[in-house]
């Protein structure tokens, strides 16, 4: 098949179709949705929360070994939606980059710098025929010394933007519609409201009530800027508060 034929646009990452599309990049976005996971991120006035559905594909798996939340440094967290193997590779490289940044400059890598680095790396993967785009959307969260709580989303095409709230993966548009209503008047959510808004969005989109073991919740707070994953007991408290409120 010649490079100019329709199939050629599908096979070669670096060739634009006559309509100006890069099919392999579009397929990377489809791979993210094909993972069947929905992720939510919400930024409050003094905290950031990310939530994702925790699916254990095999009953014999140890569910503590299944995660989509990764600490990059003590203060930066990453929620990966999509292909887990691609995510782990990206996370390891991001950790190396953050450690090198700390060694070179003497302070922690800011959230926006990490997001830009991930986006730059993803964009390079769209230029070379011997690489393929990563099938991962990464949400990066942390507290910026100057700007406070920060939430960024990086996609396989190399875009990265700061968000008040966002979603990735399956049913992401439905989640964004839900979040737009919640964020309409630019509310200043407390820590509890931030976490519960994120969990409520996931429940609303997937139309099910979760057990604490079925979701993962990662948070960073201004008064304690370390990234951490909530325990099942802490998640249970928020689920109870949501059910009582509703």
Curated annotation (Swiss-Prot):
Keyword set includes Cell cycle: no
Keywords: Cytoplasm, Nucleus, Proteasome
Matches recorded under Pfam families: Proteasome, Proteasome_A_N
Subcellular location: Cytoplasm; Nucleus
Primary localization class, coarse: cytoplasm
Domain of life per record: Eukaryota
CDD domains: proteasome_alpha_type_6
Keyword Zinc appears in the UniProt entry: no
BP GO terms, sorted: proteasome-mediated ubiquitin-dependent protein catabolic process
Residues of the signal peptide: none
One GO CC annotation: nucleus
Gene3D superfamilies noted in UniProt: Glutamine Phosphoribosylpyrophosphate, subunit 1, domain 1
Family: Belongs to the peptidase T1A family.
Reported function: The proteasome is a multicatalytic proteinase complex which is characterized by its ability to cleave peptides with Arg, Phe, Tyr, Leu, and Glu adjacent to the leaving group at neutral or slightly basic pH. The proteasome has an ATP-dependent proteolytic activity.
Assembly and oligomerization: The 26S proteasome consists of a 20S proteasome core and two 19S regulatory subunits. The 20S proteasome core is composed of 28 subunits that are arranged in four stacked rings, resulting in a barrel-shaped structure. The two end rings are each formed by seven alpha subunits, and the two central rings are each formed by seven beta subunits. The catalytic chamber with the active sites is on the inside of the barrel.
This protein's name: Proteasome subunit alpha type-6
Organism: Glycine max (Soybean)
């Amino acid at each position: 098949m010649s490079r100019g034929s329709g199939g050629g646009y599908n096979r070669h990452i670096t060739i634009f179709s006559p309509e100006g599309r890069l099919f392999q990049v579009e397929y990377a976005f489809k791979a993210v949705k094909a993972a069947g996971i929905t992720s939510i991120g919400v930024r409050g006035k003094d905290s950031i929360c990310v939530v994702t559905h925790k699916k254990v594909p095999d009953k014999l798996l140890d569910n503590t070994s299944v995660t989509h939340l990764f600490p990059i440094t003590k203060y930066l967290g990453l929620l990966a939606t999509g292909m887990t193997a691609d995510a782990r590779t990206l996370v390891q490289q991001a950790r190396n980059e953050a450690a090198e940044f700390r060694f070179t400059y003497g302070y922690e890598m800011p959230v926006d710098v990490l997001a830009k680095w991930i986006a730059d790396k993803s964009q390079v993967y769209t230029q070379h025929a011997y690489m393929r785009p990563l099938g991962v959307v990464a949400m990066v969260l942390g507290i910026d010394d100057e700007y406070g709580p920060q939430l960024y989303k990086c996609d396989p095409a190399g875009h990265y933007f700061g968000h008040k709230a966002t979603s990735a993966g399956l049913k992401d548009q439905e989640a964004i519609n839900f979040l737009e209503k919640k964020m309409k008047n630019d509310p200043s959510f407390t820590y509890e409201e931030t976490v519960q808004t994120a969990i409520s969005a996931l429940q609303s989109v997937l139309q099910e009530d979760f057990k604490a073991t079925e979701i993962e919740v990662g948070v960073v707070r201004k008064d304690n800027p370390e990234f951490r994953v909530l325990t099942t007991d802490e998640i249970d408290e928020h689920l109870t508060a949501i059910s009582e409120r509703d």
